[in-house]
Amino acid sequence: MSFLRPLPQALRAEAARIGGLAARCLVLEVETWPKPGLVSHVDNGSHTDMDAGSFRRSAAAIEPFLARLALAGIEGASMPRLRAIGLEAEGAMLRATGGVNTHRGAIFGLGLLCAAAGARLKGAQGTLGDVVERLWGGEILGTPSAPDSHGGCAALRYGAGGARQEAAAGFPTLY
């Protein structure tokens, strides 16, 4: 167990690098244009409650948590631990944006990929999606989705699988 032996500084530095790269991806996403209806550095799209500045503040606020998720992956953490870190990240995001959800989905999906990248540093094999599916897929589906979330509403209304099923299956749309 990793709490009995401290992790080498090189692994801690790599986890921080993973978190930094993930946060940079979030900033680059908001700087991508055109994307009709979505927030960019050019306009707010169809949104009145968020802008590029709120996305940048959010990305900066959640960066340390993305690094912690990578570190948790290195340490072989279970889904409940990843979920707890994700909820802390969500709180930081909401504080940074005045209560606006800019990156809840990214905290979930990209956070899992950060954890998988960490697990690969300790020898997990396969794509990041393979690692997510193998290490946490069952646990992702083992808890009920929030019925008031967008994904929960879509699942009820359309029978769509949503982000949780996509993640649990190893992100087959990506891989």
Residue positions per predicted region:
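Phosphate-rich cofactor/ligand-interacting catalytic cores and adjacent structured alpha/beta frameworks
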Residues: 1-75, 79-80, 117-175
